[in-house]
């Protein structure tokens, strides 16, 4: 939905009051994309620029558009995060430590209180996977617009429940597939639409990573203990847990539950929840979801006829139940199309996102390159005449300088190469998450439908 992606902010648009649920890694990133950063992060970015003038993250953040919003409420079940969220929400001038701050948002202990607060117009959800759909539906039923991080849900039935609630309530809903804002993906959609690759029968996507952080072995935060973490709320509704456990045992999937009882307090499970099916959707819900959405955006594939997966826990022997190696094959017989997905968390070798056509192949990331097939029918004469080379790309699209100067960690580099950190609009570099949040807010103001939700509400789901 290109119209939604490029909605220009209205100068007289109303201020939208935001409530945030979850201030962990992604919650902090979403707040920065919305214009509110931790003062300590500002300090860190300033210092990074002093040490390396090519590191322009601070300048880019300060130049980020004001989205005309106010953070009025925050919720996190870890006290350290909750208090940090309050401070961040008051950082209306983007100040470092010791700066001048604005009114502090109210901290709520439960999401139920936040979504029913009268001074909240819209809710951003950045909690663990197993809470996404529950909080999203509660917010929508309370009449709040919703920005929900991917994945949409923890289970398949919940997906349909969320969709129905969105339809019934009519709230503006945005799912956190910020790749929709990536210029190269939109250019790739045009190229496919113009038939430049010929018939495309095979697509290959890959999400390899090779670092502890990339494998979800996140830091245990100082100050975390049973007194500062609401473990009971993290685990969730006992009836829902029982339903999950009954499903797993009845289908002989006990090996995916893990050796520890879910009621047992665990800092590893709290901070590294992505490693356990009890809370996570694994590689498919964390990484494949971005790749699949990109392919769907580019080729409008919808739901496949079949999907087959295999893999296991082959490298990280740390008690996790979620595989660190996964491969999945998707089939669309009616489209004469197959997509192959592969991932390992123990190798950073990248095989790209490649669309293989009869006449040419296209690789898409934060740049786009098309290489002709040496046996192409469409370009046979041009190949024979030496006009189109077969050993190098004959078309490369670079929307902006292909630089990773301000990318400092393996995980950031991973997302940057996929166009999930930044893109370019009219030559200006933007954080894709910032653009995605901006699109959502402008859809609220202008009565439009966000780019991702238009797919979710379609008959293809």
PLM region spans:
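Solvent-exposed loop/turn segments at secondary-structure junctions
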Residues: 23-27, 77-81, 129-131, 153-155, ...
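Non-transmembrane alpha-helical segments in soluble domains
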Residues: 27, 31, 35, 86, ...
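N-terminal glycine-/serine-/threonine-rich beta1-alpha1-beta2 phosphate-ribose binding loop
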Residues: 1-145, 160-172
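Contiguous beta-strand/loop segments that form the cofactor/metal-binding neighborhood of enzyme cores
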Residues: 186-187, 199-208, 212-456
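A contiguous active-site-proximal alpha/beta segment in oxidoreductase catalytic domains
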Residues: 145, 153-230
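Generic alpha-helical secondary structure signal
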Residues: 134, 154-157, 161, 432-439
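Short basic (Lys/Arg) and small-residue
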Residues: 150
């Amino acid at each position: 939905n290109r119209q939604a992606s490029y909605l220009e902010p209205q100068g007289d648009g109303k201020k939208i009051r935001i409530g945030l649920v979850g201030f962990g890694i992604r919650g902090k990133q979403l707040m920065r994309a919305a214009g509110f950063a931790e003062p300590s992060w500002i300090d860190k970015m300033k210092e990074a620029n002093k040490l390396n003038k090519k590191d322009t993250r601070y300048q880019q953040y300060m130049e980020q558009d004001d989205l005309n919003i106010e953070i009025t409420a925050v919720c996190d079940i870890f006290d350290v995060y909750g208090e940090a969220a309050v401070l961040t929400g008051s950082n209306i001038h983007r100040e470092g430590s010791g700066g001048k701050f604005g009114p502090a948002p109210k901290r709520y202990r439960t999401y139920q209180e936040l979504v029913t607060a009268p001074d909240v117009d819209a809710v951003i959800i950045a909690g663990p996977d197993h809470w996404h759909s529950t909080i999203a539906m509660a917010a929508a039923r309370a009449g709040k617009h919703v920005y929900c991080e991917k994945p949409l849900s923890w289970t398949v039935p919940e997906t349909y429940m969320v969709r129905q609630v969105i339809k019934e309530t009519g709230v503006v809903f945005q799912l956190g597939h910020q790749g929709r804002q990536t210029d190269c993906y939109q250019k790739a959609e045009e190229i496919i639409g113009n038939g430049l690759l010929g018939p495309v029968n095979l697509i290959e996507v890959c999400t390899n990573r090779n670092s502890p952080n990339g494998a979800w072995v996140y830091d245990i935060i100082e100050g975390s203990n049973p007194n500062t973490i609401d473990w009971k709320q993290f685990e969730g509704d006992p009836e829902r847990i029982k339903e999950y456990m009954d499903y797993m045992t009845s289908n002989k999937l006990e090996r995916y539950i893990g050796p520890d009882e879910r009621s047992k307090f665990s800092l590893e499970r709290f901070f590294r929840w992505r490693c356990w099916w009890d809370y996570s959707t694994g590689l498919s819900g964390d990484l494949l979801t971005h790749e699949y959405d990109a392919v769907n955006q580019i080729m409008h594939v919808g739901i496949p006829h079949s999907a087959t997966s295999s893999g296991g826990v082959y490298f990280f022997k740390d008690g996790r139940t979620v595989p660190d190696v996964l491969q999945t094959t998707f089939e669309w017989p009616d489209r004469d199309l197959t997509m192959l997905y592969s991932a390992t968390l123990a190798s950073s070798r990248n095989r790209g996102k490649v669309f293989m056509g009869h006449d040419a192949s296209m690789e898409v990331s934060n740049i786009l390159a098309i290489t002709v097939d040496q046996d192409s029918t469409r370009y046979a004469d041009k190949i024979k005449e030496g006009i189109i080379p077969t050993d190098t790309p004959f078309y490369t699209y670079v929307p902006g300088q292909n630089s990773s100067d301000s990318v400092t960690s393996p995980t950031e580099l991973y997302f940057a190469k996929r166009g999930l950190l930044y893109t370019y609009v009219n030559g200006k570099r933007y954080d894709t998450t910032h653009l995605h949040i901006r699109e959502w807010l402008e859809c609220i103001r202008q009565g439009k439908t966000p780019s991702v939700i238009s797919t979710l509400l379609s008959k293809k789901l």
